A protein has these predicted regions:
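Surface-exposed, proline-anchored Ser/Thr-rich loop/turn motifs
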Residues: 1-12, 19-25, 56, 75-78
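Short, surface-exposed loop/turn motifs with a glycine/proline- and acidic-biased composition
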Residues: 6, 12-14, 31-66
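Extracellular and select intracellular beta-sandwich modules with Ser/Thr-enriched
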Residues: 68-72
Length: 78
């Protein structure tokens, strides 16, 4: 299973997108670098930071871009 996260950057900034489980444990860092302004997307293939597949369930993802921070839920189905 894969999922695509889409976001829009109004200006060039450092972006960090991290996936967490429902207990707040970090599962996967998807992006952690500076990106140019524009419409962006990143694909998560349900693999954690250690290269292991994760279980189906509810996950949180947090997008940090400059001063902007947003945390949202997603459901991973297998």
């Amino acid at each position: 299973p894969v999922t695509t996260l889409r976001y829009d950057l109004p200006e060039q900034t450092h972006v960090n997108i991290t996936v967490y489980d429902m207990l707040g444990r970090q599962v996967k860092t998807l992006i952690n670098h500076t990106q140019d302004a524009g419409y962006r997307s990143v694909i998560w293939n349900a693999i954690n930071d250690y290269g292991k597949p994760v279980s189906a369930g509810i996950y949180l993802y947090q997008i940090q871009a400059g001063e902007y921070i947003s945390t949202k839920k997603m459901v991973l189905l297998k």
